[in-house]
A protein has these predicted regions:
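Polytopic transmembrane helical bundles with strong interfacial aromatic enrichment
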Residues: 1-174
Length: 174
């Protein structure tokens, strides 16, 4: 088996692991829109956070796997001689756009929701977030955070973005 095919295998497998890590968070965003009980919201938020919290085993797997996705992608660009083509650079830009959009539209409202119900919350950061102490719960802040959460937009960005990435990787249009 060639180095290139081995890297393709690692890259695709690591993307599948990355998507698997998002399963609970994906479901939670839909369930949260219907929930108004702070204690249940807290449990759902903890479930969602488990996939990304670098203090937990699954969160560490997620962040290490993200490095494998990026590293194998760079390796494929070099091993395949694709770094001179446009499609891999567009793939990088699309991937970064997906990450930033998900952080803004998913991570931001979820962190504000944690804050609004009196849980420790994240002020920012990737991988090593800046955790803040719990504040007094606020029904108004909770409703505001829930109204900002749009699971349909997150789904469109995630599925649509990865469809674009898949198209670029499979068809290498330019």
């Amino acid at each position: 088996m060639s180095l290139y095919r081995s890297l393709v295998f690692v890259h695709v497998l690591s993307i599948l692991v990355l998507l698997l890590c998002h399963g609970a968070a994906f479901t939670v965003t839909y369930v949260l829109r219907q929930e108004r009980r702070p204690e249940r919201i807290g449990v759902l938020l903890d479930l969602s956070l488990a996939s990304f919290d670098s203090r937990r085993a699954l969160g560490r797997i997620f962040w290490i796997d993200l490095l494998v996705v990026v590293g194998s992608g760079i390796g494929l660009m070099i091993a395949g001689g694709w770094w001179r083509s446009w499609w891999p650079w567009l793939s990088v830009a699309v991937f970064i756009a997906i990450v930033l959009a998900m952080r803004e539209l998913g991570g931001g409202p979820l962190s504000q929701l944690r804050r609004s119900i009196g849980l420790p919350w994240i002020a920012g950061g990737f991988g090593k977030p800046d955790w803040k102490e719990p504040e007094a719960p606020s029904q108004k802040a909770m409703e505001s955070a829930l109204s900002r959460l749009n699971p349909t937009s997150l789904s469109i960005i995630g599925v649509g973005g990865f469809a674009v990435l898949l198209w670029l990787m499979m068809f290498k249009p330019f």
